[in-house]
């Protein structure tokens, strides 16, 4: 069984997405394949709870490593599970090992072709779509087909000569208008085949194309005043729009194909490999390469294609790639770089898995070495803000006042991307009267950095000012007077659009909302707000208490401080009972205070 330390590293990094997981034993053999709507929750359940089932307990004891494949939906996970179980025949999978398969939908190769669900795939020229994750889903698709199109359900031999002989009579389906009666010659082969062509599109998932087609027809019929036909088109559009495909289907004509995708970070290239066979994904593997100087992604992917095809003995006749690599293919091998369609969807699935693999590797590295995560963040900030050095020490300033009363300011400090609360500073604004944020910023920046330089204390690697161009200009001018321009970079964050301003640059930088750099800067700003507003509230409360308590005889400075510390506000002091006040400041003072406040 895997150790607790190994599990603590692996399990928290698993994605909370649908997919399939594979358990391997000490020999590297797949012993179990499962599907999950949420991979992290499902896999964790094997290790974090007791199992009554003896087979499951034995399985868990034999697990030595875990791999997974991310897909788009729970339905896809079910399909992929089926493919992987058939490929590896894992010892602990008791279902599906007998070769039982999920249903497909077939369009038979025959006159007026029948369309129905089947588990029996025959090489008779018929077209198969699927497999579908369960009979209910296949039947649901057939129900949609039959609601839209009047197709036959009988098993009659509808060759032309037999129809001409008049050997058949219409059935109930004809009378309830679910079939147009090709058996008695009421529907031509061309008209029926036109419906079958549209059904192919529907089974391939091309719903949007069908909806567009029916909209165009509806418009044309309306203009020609053919309202009955227009109404039929409208009903078909509504049926299609209500139906939502819950899984991606690998068409059966995509067979024996290798799919490769590429991702990279500063030092490593990641290449994901998927092999498609018989309409299913039966192998997924991600390879890592240590990047060398001046080695292009084309060269790395080309090398990986050769290695992975040899390792897994692939004889795929087609290779799907994200970009041209210059890889030399044999005469019998086709290279495809898809822009749309089913192969593009497969490439996107491979790209999703390689991106998840890279993310999980980073998370596991951070689990083992939290300092690496912090270093990664500050280097990201350096890159995004074009700084000369990584900002390991950042200071952020915020002013706080209400209509110019009790003006204060706060400075919060982040070190290695995290708050360093012991270094936070509060400031009373001393030289500014009235609401003047720019003048307040000049005073605080001047006082703070004059002290740091005079006492030879370390300067920050970056200053963040809460506010737009005006606040930034005020702080920049003050740093210039102190001779610190060029020594400390400074930026301003405008709150409305989260724009980042640089001194003397009218064009702001707008980072992606998911950017780690923006998240750190927002955290700085929010922390400065919180710290500054809290300080301002305390100052106002003290002033309020002083103003209301100053004229009460016998209540001195020390008593006021005790009252503020305990009750936090004048309102609470006023609502307190005399006994509660007595317990804090004594009976005599409590009586004076209680009576004095009520006179007011």
UniProtKB/Swiss-Prot annotation:
User: Keywords on this record?
Assistant: Cytoplasm, DNA damage, DNA excision, DNA repair, Excision nuclease, SOS response
Q: Which CDD domains does the record match to this protein?
A: GIY-YIG_UvrC_Cho
* GO BP field: nucleotide-excision repair; SOS response
Name which cysteines form disulfide bonds.
none
Q: PROSITE patterns recorded for this chain?
A: GIY_YIG, UVRC
Task: Tell me which family the UniProt entry assigns to this protein.
Answer: Belongs to the UvrC family.
UniProt xrefs under NCBIfam families: uvrC
Job description of the protein: The UvrABC repair system catalyzes the recognition and processing of DNA lesions. UvrC both incises the 5' and 3' sides of the lesion. The N-terminal half is responsible for the 3' incision and the C-terminal half is responsible for the 5' incision.
> What's the protein called, per UniProt?
UvrABC system protein C
Gene source species:
Porphyromonas gingivalis (strain ATCC 33277 / DSM 20709 / CIP 103683 / JCM 12257 / NCTC 11834 / 2561)
Q: What is the lineage of its organism?
A: Bacteria, Pseudomonadati, Bacteroidota, Bacteroidia, Bacteroidales
The gene from which this protein is expressed is uvrC
């Amino acid at each position: 069984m895997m150790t607790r330390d190994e599990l603590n590293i692996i399990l928290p990094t698993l994605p909370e997405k649908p997919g399939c997981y594979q358990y391997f034993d000490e020999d590297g053999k797949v012993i179990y394949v499962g599907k999950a709507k949420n991979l992290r929750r499902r896999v964790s359940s094997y290790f974090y709870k007791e199992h009554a089932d003896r087979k499951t307990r034995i399985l868990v004891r034999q697990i030595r490593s875990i791999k997974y494949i991310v897909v788009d939906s729970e339905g896809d996970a079910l399909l992929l599970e089926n493919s992987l179980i058939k490929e590896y025949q894992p010892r602990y999978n008791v279902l599906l090992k007998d070769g039982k398969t999920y249903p497909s939908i077939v369009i038979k190769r025959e006159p007026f072709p029948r369309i129905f669900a089947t588990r029996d795939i025959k090489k008779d020229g018929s077209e198969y779509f699927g497999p579908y994750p369960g009979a209910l889903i296949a039947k649901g698709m057939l129900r949609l087909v039959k609601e839209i199109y009047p197709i036959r359900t009988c098993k009659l031999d509808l060759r032309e000569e037999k129809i001409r002989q008049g050997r058949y009579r219409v059935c109930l389906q004809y009378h309830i208008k679910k079939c147009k009666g090709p058996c008695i010659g009421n529907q031509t082969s061309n008209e029926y085949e036109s419906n079958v062509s549209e059904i192919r599109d529907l089974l391939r998932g091309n719903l949007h194309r069908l909806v567009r087609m029916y909209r165009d027809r509806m418009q044309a019929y309306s203009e020609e005043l053919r309202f009955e036909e227009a109404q039929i088109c409208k009903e078909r559009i509504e049926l299609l729009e209500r139906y939502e495909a819950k899984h991606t289907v690998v068409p059966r004509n995509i067979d024996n194909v290798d799919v490769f995708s590429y991702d990279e970070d500063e030092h490593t290239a990641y290449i994901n490999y998927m092999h498609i066979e018989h309409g299913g994904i039966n192998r997924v593997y991600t390879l890592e390469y240590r990047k060398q100087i001046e080695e292009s992604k084309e060269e790395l992917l080309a090398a990986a294609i050769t290695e992975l095809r040899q390792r897994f003995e692939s004889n795929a006749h087609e290779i799907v790639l994200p970009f041209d690599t210059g890889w030399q293919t044999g005469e019998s091998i086709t290279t495809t770089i898809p822009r749309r369609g089913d192969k593009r969807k497969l490439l996107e699935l491979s790209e999703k898995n390689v991106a998840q693999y890279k993310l999980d590797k980073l998370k596991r590295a951070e689990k083992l070495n939290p300092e690496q995560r912090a270093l990664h963040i500050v280097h990201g900030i350096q890159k995004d803000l074009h700084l000369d050095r990584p900002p390991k020490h950042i200071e952020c300033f915020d002013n706080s006042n209400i209509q110019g009363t009790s003006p204060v300011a706060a400075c919060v400090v982040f070190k290695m991307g995290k708050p360093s609360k012991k270094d936070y500073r509060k400031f009373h604004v001393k030289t500014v009267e009235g609401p003047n944020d720019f003048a307040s910023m000049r005073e605080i920046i001047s006082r703070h950095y004059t002290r740091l330089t005079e006492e030879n204390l370390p300067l920050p690697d970056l200053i963040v000012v809460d506010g737009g161009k005006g606040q930034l200009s005020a702080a920049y001018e003050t740093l210039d007077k102190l001779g610190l321009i060029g020594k400390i970079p400074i930026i301003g964050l405008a709150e409305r659009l989260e724009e980042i301003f640089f001194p003397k640059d009218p064009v702001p930088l707008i980072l992606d909302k998911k950017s780690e750099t923006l998240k750190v800067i927002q955290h700085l700003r929010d922390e400065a707000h919180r710290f500054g507003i809290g300080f301002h509230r305390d100052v106002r409360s003290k002033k309020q208490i002083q103003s209301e308590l100053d004229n009460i005889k016998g209540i001195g400075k020390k008593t006021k401080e005790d009252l503020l510390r305990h009750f936090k506000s004048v309102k609470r002091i006023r609502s307190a009972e005399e006994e509660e006040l007595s317990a804090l400041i004594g009976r005599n003072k409590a009586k004076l205070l209680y009576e004095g406040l009520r006179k007011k």
